[in-house]
Amino acid sequence: MPIVMKFGGTSVADAAAIENVARIVATERAAFPVVVVSAMSGVTDALLAATPASIAAIFSRHLATAEQLLSGSELERFAELVKSAETQVRALLQIQNPSNRKAVQDSIVSFGEILSSALTAAVLNLRGVEARQVDARRCIITDEEHTSAAPLLRESFARTEDELRPLVNGGVVPVLGGFIGATLQGVTTTLGRGGSDYTAALIGAALKVDEIQIWTDVTGVLTADPRVVPEAQTIDRLSYSEAAELAYFGAKVLHPKTIQPAIENSIAVRICNSRMPQERGTLVGPQSETSARTIKAIAHKTGVTVVQITSLRMLGAYGFLRALFEVFDRHRVVIDVVTTSEVSVSLSLDDASALPSIVEELQQLGTVGIEKGRAIICVVGDGLRGTAGIEARVFSTISDINVSLISQGASSINFTFVIDEERVKEAVTRLHEEFFTRDNAQNRAR
């Protein structure tokens, strides 16, 4: 069975990075790889902010990168593709007051992945690895919810099998852009930020691969964000549940939606470092590693807003919570943490763009309070099950920091709370010192 190899934006950021990707893929030729790539680092943001005056620089970057990697007819073909992409983006930017602004946005940003996949395929061929660019819109079929489309699994799996299986069986490496798909009518859509991981997982599930590899710029999943805790360590192995919790609550090396297709099809997911390909990274599978540690990692998420709804109507009433959550459902806003009392509900969310409309509806249910500038900290580990005293250690370690919205997941593998954003780095550093640095020293002393 084949494997899927997904390379993020930093892994295809420039000519040297793309050369490195070609070397990594070449070493896996015997495993029948399918390659998924993100747009070059920074390109998606640049396309989202594009104006007629700024887009020339975006496409010049692609051409300049190609000139370092290709020559002759290969370079000419890619240059034509870049020219066509720029022409199409300029036309899209000229649309005045589009009836579906998000659909236009999806079409514009899709060119980042289209160009990076074309360039990667061309470099692989030039380096002796037979490869072919495949338009991901022929494989990933979605609903019509632009900028955050949901895949239609039956159609996507069937199309992926039809498009990719003959290539894989013939020894050809398919190269696809992640993040993008199309409706049944062929209209371009995108899967939302981080969607390239999701693309890789969907393709892996469709082809029933042995392993999905996510190549990024860090060596696997770490015990904390290395930008906050420089001494954070790589975790050798995580269970699907642990990885899902960490991804959802801020460990950005893995998109949360990546896990579900892997779980449903019992596919291992390996997170690797494209700058250090010799390292094994982190393997995510059904079982966690056997470890003396109760806690595997500490994740955090900033930019969180807390919403509190207070109403005496909650007392002994049926249907209040349903009405409350339906408001968020209508606005397609995901809730992170929820706590309830007899007369109030507090919840956190990291997408506050629809908040004014949401608050207007919530005020029909009760008094609404808003707290911005908050952060979520999530302590994760299968060892939390049945281990007494973890919460006490956490709160003792950060006893001078105000904590709210304390929650333990139903799976009992995560413990989550909310604090002021200004103190999140301090809190994460202290907790890592308590549960990793100190515990490691104690284990060595035994």
Where are these regions (language model features)?
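Nucleotide/pyrophosphate-binding catalytic subdomain
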Residues: 1-254, 259, 419-420, 439, ...
